[in-house]
Amino acid sequence: CSEGVGYYNYGFRAYILLREEVYRATQGKIDFFQTPKFVRIARYGKKIQMNEGVCPAYSDCRIGLSPDRFILSYCDRALGVTSAEEQPVLPKGNNLSLHLLELFTSRVAKVGMTDGIRQVLQEESDALRAYYEQSVIFIARPAGGTSCRLAISAKGGTNAENHNHNDVGSYAVALGSETMVGDQGGPNSYPGDYFNGDAPQKYKIKGSFGHPVPVVDGRTQSSGCLLYT
């Protein structure tokens, strides 16, 4: 998702509830997670992290956001990659069905394993790096059990993506739990004209001038798909 962790938390959380309700209503005959594509979406919450709880704030993702603990726990349990130990998460939001699901995490419906799902789980198991081909986002993490705490991320893609900031070439560098330098992310709220065509010039946070990318010959990056990496 080129729009980052914030929209992942919002959208995928709702999809989890839909999956549970349909799964239970059909007694497991319809499972929206029963595809290899779901595995990639489910692992995004862990793989987009540079260090634990630290994610790059590209596009309109606000800096400091991290994947929802409930989503991470739910996906691990659905895929059978955690122990059976109960790990309840304090509920958030205003949906009673999700509240109950978060309090009783052992009730998560397990995904039936297929060769395709096992293959994607293996492909998504790299602990050191992640690369998202469509959004052209790269993550490199320190190896576990070492003293290194430095992690990096870089973003390519185009300037025609959802919630784009005309920031091809942006990056983030994290040391431990702190983002030391890089993309400042999106605003806490949107002005009424934030999505107008001239917004990248009016609001520096939405244009390349407000990002860690070069200003070449006094010119900032333009919008559109012609600018890409």
Which role fits each region the language model picked out?
Residues 1-3:
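Acidic/His metal-coordination segments adjacent to aromatic residues that form catalytic metal sites
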Residues 10-180:
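Carbohydrate-active enzyme catalytic cores, enriched for enzymes
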Residues 146, 220-222:
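Active-site/binding-pocket entry motifs
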Residues 186-220:
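Conserved active-site neighborhood of enzyme catalytic/cofactor-binding cores
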Residues 228-229:
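Conserved small/polar residues in nucleotide/adenosyl-binding loops
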